Regions:
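Double-stranded RNA-binding/processing signature
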Residues: 1-230
Length: 230
């Protein structure tokens, strides 16, 4: 049975752990069980389901109590707080990767798949924390590690999705709406990679990659915003 350094994890989470197995399960990706049949704890997907609900409730409650914005903006704030990119960056900052249990194949993938695994992991850890210590402990952790990002999200306009931000900027500057085109599409049906470009008229202003056309468009819009070629 793999071991987790309880004292180290308690220091990271800033909470006392009563049942370490809950956290060991929270760090266990489904793929690990395929290579370790004797492992006698479940993978983290059910715990992730629970933690996702706790995280969303905590974020919603905080936004409702502290911000007077309309419902649509509060929803956008919350989405920016709990999307996989934000959660994976928080999990990386906390050093969760050292605790992850996954297959050798998954361990080699350092791209988007790893980001998703880390995002799911932090939700599972919140689920474990809820079962181990209750809602208030989760609230303290979420406020300290997740909600602290909110001011930057609002100040930088990160709650507005990149495609909407790019469109607003383009229409302000020259009244043109950007459009997107497929550059390439590779891979089998179950694991495709799309490369799309963002265009202003005939000029390419950004390019992005993703497992779906929608995500590649978002990536292209992000690239265009960074390059600011329009």
């Amino acid at each position: 049975m793999p071991k987790i350094n309880q004292e180290e994890l308690e220091n990271i989470l800033q909470t006392k752990i009563n049942n370490l197995d809950l956290y060991l399960s929270a760090f266990t990706h489904r793929s690990y069980l395929n290579e370790n049949r004797s492992f006698n704890l479940p993978h983290n997907e059910r715990m992730e389901f629970l933690g996702d609900a706790v995280l969303e409730l905590c974020a919603t409650e905080y936004l409702y109590k502290n911000y007077s914005h309309p419902e649509g903006e509060l929803t956008n704030f919350r989405s920016a707080l709990v999307n996989y990119k934000m959660l994976s960056s928080i999990a990386s900052r906390l050093g969760f990767e050292k605790f992850l249990l996954m297959s050798r194949g998954e361990a080699k993938d350092m791209g988007r798949a790893r980001q998703v695994i880390l995002a799911n992991c932090i939700e599972a850890v919140i689920g474990a924390m809820y079962l181990d210590s209750g809602y208030q402990t989760c609230t303290n952790f979420i406020a300290r590690e997740v909600l602290v990002e909110l001011d930057n999200i609002i100040e930088d306009g990160k709650y507005i999705d990149p495609k909407s931000r790019l469109q607003e900027l383009m229409q302000e500057k020259n009244g043109i709406t950007p459009h997107y085109g497929v550059i390439s599409e590779t891979g089998p049906d179950h694991n495709k990679t799309f490369v799309l470009a963002a265009f202003v008229g005939e000029k390419e202003v950004g390019r992005g990659t993703g497992p779906s056309k929608q995500e590649a468009e978002i990536s292209a819009a992000e690239d265009a915003l960074k390059k600011n070629l329009f």
